[in-house]
């Protein structure tokens, strides 16, 4: 599997102009996310175009588990923002609403982290964020 490596971890902290969606990863049958790739891509495109994230990392059951019909899509979105992470995640969910009616009704668990904040959390031994970076799948 193409999980994030330590090298990828450090790429999070390098400035990136615009994230690009890695459709080849989304459609790779080795990853559980391939089953919803066509439904997920419009959401990711909107996210990249409207919110300009540095990176989008998929974690949870669609990355390395066995997603069920009731599974949500867990995303770590790395980006600078003037809003609080919670406010930014709420804005993203609101932007997704029209797609839920026109494309596919996917449920999301969205976590937004500033690159510097994420680096500090990992440096302080934050196991949760470290595991996401180490085991997640970088989608953009």
What are these regions (language model features)?
Residues 2-55, 64-69, 79-140:
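Catalytic core of pol beta-like nucleotidyltransferases
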Residues 59-61:
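Glycine-rich beta-strand-to-loop/alpha-helix junction loops that act as flexible
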Residues 74-78:
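Short beta-strand->loop micro-motif that forms the acidic, two-metal-ion catalytic signature
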């Amino acid at each position: 599997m193409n999980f994030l490596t330590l090298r990828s971890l450090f790429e999070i902290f390098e400035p990136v102009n615009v994230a690009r969606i890695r459709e080849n990863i989304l459609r790779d049958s080795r990853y559980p996310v391939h089953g919803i790739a066509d439904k997920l891509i419009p959401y990711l495109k909107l996210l990249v175009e409207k919110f300009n994230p540095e990176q989008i990392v998929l974690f949870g059951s669609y990355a390395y588990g066995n997603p069920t019909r009731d599974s949500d899509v867990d995303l770590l979105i790395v980006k600078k923002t003037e809003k609080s992470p919670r406010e930014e995640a709420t804005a993203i969910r609101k932007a997704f609403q029209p797609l839920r009616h026109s494309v596919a009704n996917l449920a999301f668990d969205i976590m937004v982290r500033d690159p510097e904040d994420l680096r500090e959390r990992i440096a302080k031994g934050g196991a949760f964020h470290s595991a996401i970076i180490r085991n997640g799948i970088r989608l953009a």
